[in-house]
A protein has these predicted regions:
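Short Lys/Arg-rich basic patches
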Residues: 1-7, 20, 62-69, 74-75
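Residues at or immediately flanking beta-strands
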Residues: 5, 49-51
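Generic leucine side-chain signal with a strong bias for well-ordered alpha-helical environments
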Residues: 6-8, 16-19, 31, 36
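Surface-exposed, Lys/Arg-rich phosphate-binding patches that contact polyanionic backbones
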Residues: 10-27, 45, 53
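Short, basic amphipathic alpha-helical segments that act as recognition/interaction helices
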Residues: 28-48, 61-64
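Short acidic-glycine loop/turn motifs at beta-strand connectors
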Residues: 56-59
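Non-DNA-binding regulatory cores of transcription-related proteins
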Residues: 77-79
């Protein structure tokens, strides 16, 4: 097992804590695991040539996620 430690600004820690409250996540480890799961899914989708977006079903609109790390993803699925 590897221990990972992060130094974050106070404001970012407040944002993380608010996300945890909103989603009923109890530990920062669980928050990290959820974030990692979502990121892995996004990378796999980008490798498959898909667009990552949020869809507003009521207004029939969508908004593409723009994230520099995902712009670097190309090629076949390997996850």
């Amino acid at each position: 097992m590897v221990r990972i430690q992060l130094d974050l600004p106070d404001e970012q820690v407040k944002e993380l804590d608010e996300l945890m409250r909103e989603t009923n996540i109890v530990t920062r480890k669980d928050l990290f695991n959820n974030a990692l799961t979502l990121f892995q899914w996004a990378v796999k989708a980008k490798r498959a040539g898909r667009i990552i977006a949020s869809i507003d079903e009521q207004n029939k609109t969508s908004k593409e996620l723009v994230m520099p790390a995902l712009e670097n993803v190309h090629g076949p699925v390997s996850i």
